[in-house]
Each structure stands twice: as structure tokens, then as C-alpha cells.
Design a protein with these regions (language model features):
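N-terminal accessory targeting/assembly segments
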Residues: 1-119
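Extended, highly charged alpha-helical segments
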Residues: 114-150
Length: 150
């Protein structure tokens, strides 16, 4: 199935294999994170991909470089290879630097919940105005993430 919108983030020519990642921070329960990952799994399915793994980590705060820390990122890389995942989706917003660092460490695409939601909107935009609005939102999302990609 080909993408109906040229700016989508998940490749719909096949069903991408996705690993989900959630982090339990102080003040948040493991049950809340699991419920959020369940919702994210539904979003990923709506975007046309299959969840093949999920990882939850407890942390006091996000790692500024990799969000989950280098050790967990290495575990994610191993898991992603083992389950032949195409993409790793984080339940929380990644900074552009975190996304770049994770993609280097994981050896595959790393995106966040916002990217999945934008992708669903891109897939379902039909009117010219809707397509233009989605394209603008995608450009705003991607702009800070373009450094070093050209």
C-alpha cells in the first residue's frame, strides 16, 4: 500500500515493524505508562504498522542525549535487531538531538508519539486545505530535525 501523502513518516508500502518505548518517571505509575503504550500501539496500528516489542524503563529524569540512557539504548538496539524492527517509537516527545543520537545508536529510525499522530493525519488528509495544513505541521515538526541530514 503506497502512501497517499508524500510527507508521511511511516512507510506504507509494507507494514513496518515497531518497538514501543515508555519511561516511568517519579509521579507517574507503571500502570499509567502501560496504558499510554496501549494507546500508542493503537495509533501505530492506525498508521499502518505492527508492534513487535515494547520496553518500559524507570528513570528519575530523561537523559539529555538519548532520553533513556546509553545502556537502555544499547538494549533497544539489540531488541530491535532480534525482532527485526524497522522503527522505534517513543511515547514522549524527543528533542531533535535525542532523535539523532538514538538513530545513530539504534541503527534505525527513532520517532515519537507526535510523529505517529502527524503521520496518521497525513495519511487521512483528503481536502486540499487539509493536506496543506498537514504538510505545514510536518514541516514545522521536521525543520529542527534536519541538521546534518544533507
Amino acid at each position: 500500500m503506497s502512501a497517499p501523502f508524500p510527507g508521511t513518516l511511516i512507510d506504507r508500502s509494507f507494514r513496518e515493524r515497531i518497538v514501543l518505548v515508555g519511561v516511568v518517571f517519579p509521579g507517574t505509575s507503571a500502570e499509567e505508562v502501560e496504558a499510554s503504550l496501549d494507546e500508542l500501539a493503537l495509533l501505530v496500528d492506525s498508521a499502518g504498522a505492527d508492534v513487535v516489542g515494547r520496553v518500559v524503563q524507570r528513570r528519575d529524569h530523561p537523559d539529555p542525549a538519548t532520553y533513556v540512557g546509553r545502556g537502555k539504548a544499547a538494549e533497544l538496539a539489540d531488541l530491535s535487531r532480534a525482532v527485526d524492527a524497522d522503527t522505534v517509537v517513543f511515547d514522549e516527545e524527543l528533542t531533535p538531538a535525542q532523535q539523532r543520537n538514538l538513530e545513530k545508536l539504534l541503527g534505525r529510525t527513532a520517532i515519537d508519539r507526535t510523529a505517529v499522530i502527524l503521520d496518521i493525519f497525513a495519511q487521512n488528509a483528503r481536502s486540499p486545505e487539509g493536506k496543506a495544513q498537514v504538510e505545514m505541521a510536518l514541516m514545522r515538526y521536521r525543520l529542527p530535525r534536519l541538521r546534518g541530514r544533507g
